[in-house]
Amino acid sequence: IILEESLGATFVESLGGTPVTPEIEKLKKQGWWFEQLYATGTRSVRGIEAVVTGFPPTPAQSTVKLSLAQRNFSTLAAILGQQGYESEFIYGGESHFDNMRSFFLANGFNRVTDENDYVSPVFRGSWGVSDEDLFNKTHERLVEKQKTGKPSFTLVFTSSNHAPFEFPDGRISLYEQPKNTDNNAVKYTDYALGKFVEKAKTSDYWKNTVFVVVADHDIRVRGDSLVPIERFHIPGLILGADIKPRVIKTVASQLDLPP
């Protein structure tokens, strides 16, 4: 599962957004594309909670931070672990943020890879290494896992599309000036995703891996007004060697991803 930071429908042209995700627009024609998928919240921890556990949002704090959820809490990793899967969380930043590391390792994940595990990254910013580095590490780990012959589950969480929107120069043609804006950062994240999928398709692990690309949430919603449903609209895509293109118009949420 590739959990894309803040990459909501706001940034996907075919979903009514700004045209800054050309790679996703290409990839959506190659797999299952969800046109009416919605996030459960407006923060990353809510996206993690929904995608990894299928648990609906709780008042005040996410289950990822609640003390009683720090062990024996049902997650995709725990469920797959019962079937012999090894699970890993890969992040480009500090994994202790939002209590992710503790929650994952206590609830089915066998390994956490974070900012400290990158040697000579291409770029390092306020939120850690770039999404290029993240995907290079993901590719490296998937190659290693393929060689073991054991089934595995990997959760990858991007971060380049997070304020202050820092990313390496020379990768994309900027959508706007100045450089460090959300639109440009999303375009870079999209670029990094496209490069990763391109590399994955030439690798042995492509033939037996299912890839799920989904946003954690759209851009932040503020104020005491009626909930703007359009601000919870996110893209969702399932890719794989044997997955035939399909457009799914059924209304769904992140809660529908895990069993």
What are these language model-derived features?
Residues I1-P259:
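Solvent-exposed soluble domains appended to multi-pass membrane proteins
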